[in-house]
Curated annotation (Swiss-Prot):
It catalyses: [GlcNAc-(1->4)-Mur2Ac(oyl-L-Ala-gamma-D-Glu-L-Lys-D-Ala-D-Ala)](n)-di-trans,octa-cis-undecaprenyl diphosphate + beta-D-GlcNAc-(1->4)-Mur2Ac(oyl-L-Ala-gamma-D-Glu-L-Lys-D-Ala-D-Ala)-di-trans,octa-cis-undecaprenyl diphosphate = [GlcNAc-(1->4)-Mur2Ac(oyl-L-Ala-gamma-D-Glu-L-Lys-D-Ala-D-Ala)](n+1)-di-trans,octa-cis-undecaprenyl diphosphate + di-trans,octa-cis-undecaprenyl diphosphate + H(+). GO terms for cellular component: cell division site; plasma membrane. This is Probable peptidoglycan glycosyltransferase FtsW. Pathway: Cell wall biogenesis; peptidoglycan biosynthesis. The chain crosses the membrane at residues 11-31, 48-68, 77-97, 134-151, 154-174, 177-197, 265-285, 306-326. InterPro entries: FtsW (IPR013437), FtsW/RodA (IPR001182). It comes from Riesia pediculicola (strain USDA). Keywords: Cell cycle, Cell division, Cell inner membrane, Cell membrane, Cell shape, Cell wall biogenesis/degradation, Glycosyltransferase, Membrane, Peptidoglycan synthesis, Transferase, Transmembrane, Transmembrane helix. It comes from the Bacteria. GO terms for biological process: cell wall organization; FtsZ-dependent cytokinesis; peptidoglycan biosynthetic process; regulation of cell shape. It is a multi-pass membrane protein. Peptidoglycan polymerase that is essential for cell division. Belongs to the SEDS family. FtsW subfamily. It is found in: Cell inner membrane.
Length: 369
């Protein structure tokens, strides 16, 4: 029997289209940065092309990995993530005051990206188990350890993404109100404490509320991001015609690439990106629902968790760029420049494709019996 009709072609097609779009937009947005930092205005385009090819090859490999192996190796994955986070204190590369990358000569690794997958696997395994008395303590311990290590970098953005996905997961599976309220209270307390004890986070919050009050200081990024959107209007200025990317807007090819998309392709271009990302999200949630209907609890919860991670990160990135959320320094999934982020996001989508494939195969086998 041919299995080609079991592949989720729409999800795969949207992912490939976004990867191609990423190559174009990173190439356009990074011209000035590449010329200034590396004296080669195409340097980021070339590296992003390589990242995209590697990501596609990894997707093919991951798609052929049975889902049960992710559950089987969840402890190894989370342990590996914790070890990599620990090594950042000794071998991490500092950038803008944060140690988030490890230089392995041939590439830079961002351990916090691996945490997103390993934590999803661990959480999904926990939720799919019937006896949770001992595993609850282990889960809480891992959450606290990972939180401490992420804050030591500091990487507040990844922590917000993980906690947000955790709370939404608990809500989706119908956890009791008391447990959900307690988790929300703990998360809120941590966030407020971090803002209070870290002056630069408080300044970011103030600048987010009124960026024009200090447009040459903490509000600089947001002001120039807004100017990009204002200049783009409905249809944009055309690819390559952004002004803000020319040494005005910091990180135009990473954290603020949506601003350059808005300036060059307008609100229409932004709408297409938002629709594509939400398409991936709803596809993932539908895949998870079908897996749960087939009593594949780990697969279903994993699909939910992955989908939430992708859309929450997307909302935070776009929201901070348009001024409705504080700036967190997160990339736009698939689109932004960044090898680790692109690779891990593509691996997540490959896992979704595999879950969908296995669910369809199970239905066919059950029908034959």
């Amino acid at each position: 029997m041919k299995k080609s009709h079991l592949y989720n072609r729409s999800l795969l097609s949207v992912t490939i289209i976004l990867l191609i779009f990423s190559i174009i937009m990173v190439g356009s947005s990074s011209v000035s940065v590449g010329n200034r930092i590396r004296t080669d205005y195409l340097s980021f385009l070339k590296k992003n092309f390589i990242h995209s090819i590697i990501s596609i090859l990894c997707m093919i490999f991951v798609f052929n990995v049975p889902i049960y192996k992710w559950k089987k190796n969840k402890n190894k994955l989370i342990l590996c993530s914790i070890i990599l986070l620990l090594t950042l204190n000794y071998f991490g590369i500092s950038n803008h005051g944060a140690k988030r990358w490890i230089n392995i000569k041939i590439a830079f690794i961002q351990p916090s990206e691996l945490v997103k997958i390993s934590f999803s696997c661990y959480l999904s395994s926990y939720l799919s188990e019937k006896n949770k008395k001992t595993s609850t303590i282990q889960l809480i311990s891992i959450i606290l350890i990972v939180s401490k290590l992420l804050l030591s970098q500091p990487d507040f953005g990844t922590l917000v993404i993980l906690y947000s996905s955790l709370l939404f997961m608990l809500f989706l599976i119908g956890k009791n109100f008391l447990f959900l309220s307690a988790s929300s209270a703990i998360f809120t307390t941590i966030v407020l404490s971090l803002i209070y004890f870290r002056s630069y986070r408080a300044k970011r919050l103030i600048s987010f509320l009124n960026p024009w009050s200090n447009y040459l200081g903490d509000g600089y990024q947001l002001v120039h991001s807004m100017l990009s959107f204002g200049r783009g209007k409905m249809f944009g200025q055309g690819i390559g015609n952004s002004i803000q990317k020319i040494n005005f807007l910091p990180e135009p090819h990473t954290d603020f690439i949506i601003s350059i998309i808005g300036e060059e392709l307008g609100y229409l271009g932004i709408a297409m990106i938002v629709i594509s990302l939400f398409f991936i999200f709803f596809q993932g949630m539908n895949i998870g629902r079908n897996a749960l209907k087939d009593f594949q609890y780990f697969s279903g919860f994993l699909a939910y968790s992955i989908s939430l991670l992708i859309i929450i990160q997307s909302i935070i990135n776009i929201g901070s760029s348009i001024g409705i959320l504080p700036i967190k320094g997160t990339t736009l999934p698939i689109i932004s420049y960044g090898g680790s982020s692109k690779l891990i996001t593509c691996i997540k989508i490959a896992i979704l494709l595999r879950i969908d494939f296995e669910t369809k195969m199970n239905k066919i086998q059950a029908f034959r019996r």
